[in-house]
Amino acid sequence: MPSIFINIILAFATALLGTLVFRSHLMSSLLCLEGMMLSMFILSTLIILNMHFTMSFMMPILLLVFAACEAAVGLALLVMVSNTYGLDYIQNLNLLQC
């Protein structure tokens, strides 16, 4: 396995670990999710280019579309929570009381 794949998998694992460590802040969780999506995009692009899958060149672009939608929804949720409660701590929120 080339070292570029190991580096990208390590970046994904680091972002996943960051999500687990910084789960109390919504902004940190969103940044770690974006890091995971970016590493998945790069890894899928490299695999498709190395394996010459001509029929699945659209997969990384579809992944970027979903990442952009996830970022937009996450930032809208962050703005709503910070305007309502004045902070972005997830542990202090009870989302069942809408």
UniProtKB/Swiss-Prot annotation:
Keywords: Electron transport, Membrane, Mitochondrion, Mitochondrion inner membrane, NAD, Respiratory chain, Translocase, Transmembrane, Transmembrane helix, Transport, Ubiquinone. It is found in: Mitochondrion inner membrane. It catalyses: a ubiquinone + NADH + 5 H(+)(in) = a ubiquinol + NAD(+) + 4 H(+)(out). One of its GO terms (cellular component) is mitochondrial inner membrane. Core subunit of respiratory chain NADH dehydrogenase (Complex I) which is composed of 45 different subunits. Belongs to the complex I subunit 4L family. GO terms for biological process: ATP synthesis coupled electron transport. InterPro entries: NADH_UbQ_OxRdtase_chain4L/K, NUOK/Mnh_C1-like. It comes from the Eukaryota. This is NADH-ubiquinone oxidoreductase chain 4L. Core subunit of the mitochondrial membrane respiratory chain NADH dehydrogenase (Complex I) which catalyzes electron transfer from NADH through the respiratory chain, using ubiquinone as an electron acceptor. Part of the enzyme membrane arm which is embedded in the lipid bilayer and involved in proton translocation. The chain crosses the membrane at residues 2-22, 29-49, 61-81.
